[in-house]
Amino acid sequence: MTAQQLVDAILGLGVTIQPHPSNEQDCQYQSPDDPGRQDRSSVTLQEGVLLSEWASGHRVMEIGTGLGVSTVALAHHADFVHTIDPSEWVRSALTMPQNVRQWASVEDVPGTFGRIFIDGLHDFASVCKDIESALLMLSPEGQVAFHDMCQSDVRAAVDSFDWKDRIEYPTVGLLTFCMVKA
């Protein structure tokens, strides 16, 4: 998936994309159902392309859908994406791709996942809970990716777990990929 393909997919949802006024590498999105509402996704186009490649050929769980930008990127090459976010706006305004299903809570989702992307609440306790839930659903060779590692509670929560391997992409944005310790 190229950045242009991601932009085209997002535009296909009816969402308007504009450069974010305070960060040229970021985007601001406008809901087609609520033109007065401006939302910002911190998932950059470059991160979206990387997420798309990372998810390729896997069953994916996304914890924290937000505006659905990362969901679109994950779904582009994933076998199937299950996404968790209680956002009413997401449920009412976002038309998910055919290989995406949205759930109310992690406990409702059946099966295991080869890739889990966590970008939910950003306080320490919530991130730890998301990690614990993810580890219960992760396949033996699975990987977990985190967004917003620049936030101190997110970094502290990720650091509090024992990972087999960890790869950070500070030049790509705020993504960190972790593999479960064997």
Task: Locate each region found by the language model.
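A short alpha-helical cap/connector motif
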Residues: 1-117, 121-182
